[in-house]
A protein has these predicted regions:
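Nuclease catalytic cores
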Residues: 2-46
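Active-site metal-binding core of divalent-cation-utilizing nuclease and nuclease-like domains
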Residues: 27-95
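Generic detector of low-complexity/intrinsically disordered segments
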Residues: 72, 91-93, 128, 173, ...
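Domain-level recognition of nuclease-like catalytic cores that cleave nucleotide substrates
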Residues: 130-209
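Catalytic cores of nucleic-acid endonucleases
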Residues: 84-86, 97-150
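Surface-exposed beta-strand edges and their flanking turn/coil or helix-capping segments
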Residues: 69-72, 113-116, 159-160
Length: 209
């Protein structure tokens, strides 16, 4: 019997399948703002998900594996990072764990942390980077699909030629069984800490200083 693909292998498989879909549909755009370009890519990924028979959820809530810390700022406390974060897309399959997707114009985002934690949980994780230099290291278990664009100025607009099957895919290292076991243990500790935090008395409202 063939072994079941690991999350690492599935990330690569799905990145390759998404690239093939974008190539077959000749995905492209011209003269879009940054937000419009991101929405265009998001729609294309959602269409691929639907064609694959999956359910798509936008702005899907997720939790970081490590608990946030209670910080104090001015006259009130706050959790950093917040307890809840959001994935750009979560693609739900009937035959496997959901696929986490982040879509970013640059490396300056929380995508690396979110996708790293999803991969450590054994879930396929895709990072779609569509503009700018690639400087961030791809986390273990994550596949990055690069869709470079051209930009114009005054005003800034982005254009993307039709995707081909040569679009670059970069893979992170394999998630080792030891790393996954340690992450799952920390995840359980985080859940317990979150319950304790929820049971604490609510802090009073802002204090005028």
């Amino acid at each position: 019997m063939a072994p079941e693909p690991t999350a690492n292998g599935e990330s690569e498989i799905f990145a390759t399948a998404l690239r093939a879909h974008l190539s077959e549909t000749r995905f492209a755009f011209t003269g879009l703002t940054g937000k419009e370009a991101t929405r265009s890519i998001t729609r294309a990924v959602a269409e691929w998900s639907m064609a694959s028979g999956w359910r798509t959820r936008c702005e899907a809530p997720m939790r970081y594996i490590d608990p946030p810390r209670l910080q104090t700022g001015g006259c009130r406390g706050y959790w950093s990072p917040p307890w809840c974060a959001y994935l750009d897309l979560r693609l739900r399959r009937k035959d496997g764990p959901p696929i986490a997707v982040e879509i970013d114009r640059s490396d300056d985002s929380t995508a690396v942390d979110k996708l790293r934690d999803e991969a450590l949980r054994g879930r396929p994780a895709l990072w779609i980077r569509w503009h700018g230099a690639l400087r961030a290291e791809v986390p273990a278990g994550v596949a990055r699909l690069h869709l470079p664009t051209r930009s114009s100025t005054s005003p800034v607009r982005y254009s993307r030629a039709p995707v081909t099957d040569t679009a670059s895919i970069t893979l992170g290292a394999d998630v080792t069984p030891e790393a996954r076991a340690e992450a799952l243990n920390r995840d359980q500790q985080r859940k317990a800490e979150e319950k304790r935090a929820a049971a604490r008395p609510q802090a009073p409202g802002p204090i005028r200083c």
